[in-house]
Amino acid sequence: MRILCTNDDGIHAPGLKVVEEIARALSDDVWVVAPELDQSGVSHSLSLNDPLRLREVGPRHFAVRGTPTDCVIMGARHILGTKPPDLVLSGVNKGRNVAEDVVYSGTIAGALEGTILGLPSFALSQEFSVETRERPPWDTARTFGPDILRKVMAAGIPKETVINVNFPSCAPEDVLGIRVTRQGKRNLGFLRIDERRDGRNNPYFWIGFERAAMMDTPAEGTDLAALRERYVSVTPLRLDRTNEAFSEALGAALK
């Protein structure tokens, strides 16, 4: 089995080495194509107005001056064009990708691009806490990742579906199990705008997160709840975002 690995944290990110280890537990035919620079939060952006620069950094390891989406396209269509991958793994992201993160995440976008190309694809993310921010518990992803991939691949993944896996911020021995979840929802106040001043007293801004707003009790059955309760969260996400339940009412309103 040929596996293509990517991420959004960049070619030198620790989590990329972890996802490669997970991939090598399944196959010896592993290729890495990742962004030259950190692309966190770029979502599913595609580089149309800038050229892509490709750099070989080692055997079967390539850096692309572009987004995770660009990397998957370059990997599947150019680098591995004569023999495309059988599986795409995106991650392991430093930090969880749950709830509204799904919309912003370059990690999930890398997996979604694999799904668009008709390839089984997983997004993998390792949650961290305030205490473990500088040293996330990567061993949790290493421990549970390979077995989850094997079982899901054996069961088969429907078309236009990407599997979003989030590992809780605890040691492997403290994980209570695995849950299949749905996408959660945070308090609407979780984003903040932080205004600062530069040396010339001109304003500039950072978008950040209000941790207190993110600590609300999440709904049962969600990715947020699973992580809080120390379970691995496995969420099947659909590429098709059509709200079919609203289609009939929408049609009636437009008559």
Swiss-Prot record:
Its main location: cytoplasm. The keyword Nucleotide-binding applies. Its EC number is 3.1.3.5. It is found in: Cytoplasm. SUPFAM superfamilies: SurE-like. Its cofactor is a divalent metal cation. GO terms for cellular component: cytoplasm. Binds 1 divalent metal cation per subunit. One of its GO terms (molecular function) is 3'-nucleotidase activity. Belongs to the SurE nucleotidase family. NCBIfam families: PRK00346.1-4, surE. This is 5'-nucleotidase SurE. The gene is surE.
